[in-house]
UniProtKB/Swiss-Prot annotation:
This is Acetoacetyl-CoA reductase. The gene is phaB. Keywords: NADP, Oxidoreductase, PHB biosynthesis. One of its GO terms (molecular function) is acetoacetyl-CoA reductase activity. Catalyzes the reduction of acetoacetyl-CoA to (R)-3-hydroxybutyryl-CoA. When expressed in E.coli with Synechocystis PhaA, PhaC and PhaE confers the ability to synthesize up to 12% (w/w) poly(3-hydroxybutyrate) (PHB) depending on the carbon source. NADP(+) binds at residues 18-20, 82-86, 177-180. Disruption phenotype: Double deletion of phaA and phaB leads to loss of synthesis of PHB, no visible growth phenotype. Pathway: Biopolymer metabolism; poly-(R)-3-hydroxybutanoate biosynthesis. Pfam families: adh_short_C2 (PF13561). Its EC number is 1.1.1.36.
């Protein structure tokens, strides 16, 4: 039987307690990976994966989490930088606190999620990093200047890491989801949700599991062994 080659690979997913992160954790477990996830709380219901309470905005917190994960599961092969937040408003109304919160989680948080693991990947000459960007990081979105800027930054970060890591056999890619059915998008007002749906050629929002499969592909040492520095769009042709 064909396999993505993720069996027994140790993979860390940040923001893995619910939503897209939880779907990624579940799928990777089903593929035989040894999965750990970090979040501000680990009570989302997945009792099989190793949950570690950690804050992606705090490098010391993530370094401590990395030590615990490595001690319990072994050397880490893959990191999925999924944790993210929004603080939406029109540009003139965005406060310094709105900017700082989103930059700290969505951009610095991605760097701090990767940093504790990457030197080990370089030493072992194997590893795959996948960061969750967004359709907003490529096309922008009204009321999301801060969010869009961070998600564009994530793409730039992965492209740079891909160039740095190539000589060590370490790949770095981004997944850019469109509108996905999560707690975040379910909070969108119904009339706005209907308007967005009509703009999507598939005429529906995506599912967290569809993002999880894209992540699994990019993590795979079999299916995507020569893929690095790329952005995989999963948006139902909303942005091509």
């Amino acid at each position: 039987m064909l396999s993505l080659g993720l069996e027994d690979k140790v993979i860390v997913v940040t923001g893995g307690n619910r939503g897209i992160g939880a779907a990624i954790v579940k799928l990777l477990q089903e593929m035989g990976a040894k999965v750990a996830f970090t979040d501000l709380a680990t009570d989302g219901g997945n009792t099989e994966a190793l949950g570690v309470v950690a804050n992606v905005t705090d490098l010391e917190s993530m370094t401590a989490a990395a030590a615990e994960i490595t001690d319990k599961l072994g050397p880490v092969y893959g990191v999925v930088a999924n944790a993210g937040i929004t603080k939406d408003n029109f540009f003139p109304k965005l406060t310094p606190a709105d900017w700082d919160a989103v930059l700290n989680v969505n951009l610095k948080g991605v760097a701090y999620s990767i940093k504790p693991f990457i030197e080990g990947m370089y030493e072992r000459k194997a590893g795959s990093i996948v960061a969750i960007s967004s359709i907003s990081g490529e096309r922008g979105n009204v009321g999301q200047t801060n969010y869009s800027a961070t998600k564009a930054g994530v793409i730039g970060m992965m492209k740079s890491l891909a160039r740095e890591g190539a000589r060590y056999g370490v790949r770095a890619n981004a997944v850019a989801p469109g509108f996905i059915d999560t707690e975040m998008t379910l909070a969108i007002r119904e009339d706005i949700r209907e308007k967005i749906t009509k703009e999507i050629p598939f005429r529906r929002f995506g599912k967290p599991e569809e993002i999880a499969w894209a992540v699994a592909f990019l993590l795979s040492p079999v299916a995507s062994s020569y893929v690095t520095g790329e952005v995989l769009r999963v948006n139902g042709a909303h942005h091509t």
